Amino acid sequence: MTEPNDTGPALQAEHLGKVYDEGPARIEVLSDVSLSVARGEMVAIVGASGSGKSTLLHILGLLDVPSSGTVSVDGVPAAGLSEKRKSALRNRSLGFVYQFHHLLPEFSALDNVAMPLIVRRENRDRARAQAREVLELVGLAAREEHFPGQLSGGERQRVALARALVTRPACVLADEPTGNLDRHTAHNMFELLTRVNRESGTAFVIVTHDPELAARADRQLHMENGRLQPD
């Protein structure tokens, strides 16, 4: 597998298409979508439900394959990679944050954050040390031994963000990261996302319905009928 290239875009997609054949019907979900995300850039993608935003995020995250077009992550083209190598690229160079935190309830905040490194068979002590660093970055150093059930909704989402950052990815893909939070907590999450983006130099691609969060991004793009265009 080609080694990551830290001088080019964190994430690049060219002429993506996605088509589902359902019986006699042919459903085009994405049409000729191209996107280049610079290192350290925050890009917001907005659009109505069903416009193709989540499908695009899944393809950018190497969780789905396009019907046409190419994706490169950290300078590495995904086309032609085996599932094992694609998984390794995803785990090394991408982080994910979802509307629901998906934390493991039986593990502490610290061990939830360290989990991506432990799965990669990193030394456990080193993984926990790295997890402590990112928990401090998101303001939860004092809560590392608490379990998800002992944390507020906003704290759980911050743990999820720390987990996405612990591998030091080139890019974090966030799908409605504030969608399950109340207005005040969502505002605090906006502040955290922009600060982490600035301080860590990690690129972010954020799918959101929230105009306030989208307005904080370096660039806003609008998805409509499977096509991506400047907002």
UniProtKB/Swiss-Prot annotation:
Alphabetical keyword list: ATP-binding, Cell inner membrane, Cell membrane, Membrane, Nucleotide-binding, Translocase, Transport
SMART domains registered for this protein in UniProt: AAA
Protein location: Cell inner membrane
InterPro entries, A to Z: AAA+_ATPase, ABC_transporter-like_ATP-bd, ABC_transporter-like_CS, ABC_transpr_LolD-like, LolD_lipo_ATP-bd, MacB-like_ATP-bd, P-loop_NTPase
Cellular component terms per the entry's GO annotation: plasma membrane
GO biological process, one term: lipoprotein localization to outer membrane
CDD domains: ABC_MJ0796_LolCDE_FtsE (cd03255)
Highest taxon above the source species: Bacteria
Molecular function, one GO term: transmembrane transporter activity
Residues engaged in binding ATP: G47, A48, S49, G50, S51, G52, K53, S54
Enzyme Commission designation: 7.6.2.-
Record membrane topology: Peripheral membrane protein
ABC transporter domain boundaries: 11-231
Gene3D superfamilies on file: P-loop containing nucleotide triphosphate hydrolases (3.40.50.300)
Job description of the protein: Part of the ABC transporter complex LolCDE involved in the translocation of mature outer membrane-directed lipoproteins, from the inner membrane to the periplasmic chaperone, LolA. Responsible for the formation of the LolA-lipoprotein complex in an ATP-dependent manner.
Assembly information from the UniProt record: The complex is composed of two ATP-binding proteins (LolD) and two transmembrane proteins (LolC and LolE).
Similarity field: Belongs to the ABC transporter superfamily. Lipoprotein translocase (TC 3.A.1.125) family.
Protein's name in the database: Lipoprotein-releasing system ATP-binding protein LolD
Organism of origin: Bordetella pertussis (strain Tohama I / ATCC BAA-589 / NCTC 13251)
